[in-house]
């Protein structure tokens, strides 16, 4: 059966808990992932795992020292539709990929208090959905970018729109998100 805990600390102190999922607002990911690692728990952390490269390095160091599994919850690589797209492209079923357009959008501007709209909680479109446009093309094609050009729009301290055009190993990709 499931056990309920009245705090995150109590959850981490429970010897019957082997792993935790960290779905908190972005700015809390590193803090609670590190606490979970220190408590000897495997960690599945919502994206983005960290807000800064140095924080990510600290997570990697803690993971390496602990021997625990620590992973980012990133749906693209595990989703059957993207696995199939990768298989079809790699096998040549659709011919040579020359251009890819990827877009992801939703409108949450009517919710200014939403954590995705607040800079202090790590909000912004690139951290929330922008990664899916770029990541899906990169995963499906197996191509890495060699040049990028971007346009970005910000409102109230967070990015709400971006369009990135990239050259990816002979292909051209355009990645757009708006939030």
Where are these regions (language model features)?
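Alpha-helical elements of Rossmann-like donor-binding domains used by nucleotide-donor carbohydrate transfer enzymes
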Residues: 10, 19, 31, 58, ...
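A short helix->loop->beta-strand "cap" motif at the edges of active sites that frequently abuts
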Residues: 2, 39-41, 66-69, 170-172
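Rossmann-fold dehydrogenase core element
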Residues: 57-75, 96-99
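Short loop/edge segments at beta-strand edges and connector loops
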Residues: 6, 45, 53, 72, ...
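Predominantly a Rossmann-like dinucleotide-binding segment in NAD(P)-dependent oxidoreductases
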Residues: 76-149
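Short, Asp-centered acidic motifs that coordinate Mg2+ and/or phosphate
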Residues: 18-19, 99, 173
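Beta-loop-alpha module in the N-terminal Rossmann-like domain of NAD(P)-dependent dehydrogenases
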Residues: 2-61
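Contiguous beta-strand/loop segments that form the cofactor/metal-binding neighborhood of enzyme cores
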Residues: 134-179
